[in-house]
Amino acid sequence: MKSFWIGVLSSVGLIVASSTFAATAEETYKSSCAACHDAGVANAPKLGDKAAWAPRMKQGEDALYTSALKGKPGTAMVAKGGFANLSDAEVKSVVDLMIAKAK
């Protein structure tokens, strides 16, 4: 019985952690990325624009992570969108959010 409750509590913890993680990605997007990606500033692919994201997504997640983390030469996209205080994990979570919205 004890192992049953441990399993239940672990599952609840994962659900809560996932919800918190998603909210954090959304908040990070709003505070650090939306200024360019909501309006398409300097040809930034807009959030949810499937046509704009399709060729980028074909390059794979690693390429998108690299662009977000290190910047993309020849574009306005600088490393971490200019927010050097963001952790790599935070940036990757926002990339994952943006990919999900473009599917």
Where are the predicted features?
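Hydrophobic helical h-region of N-terminal Sec-dependent signal peptides
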Residues: 9-14
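Gly/Gly-Pro-rich "capping" loops immediately C-terminal to redox-active cysteine motifs
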Residues: 38-66
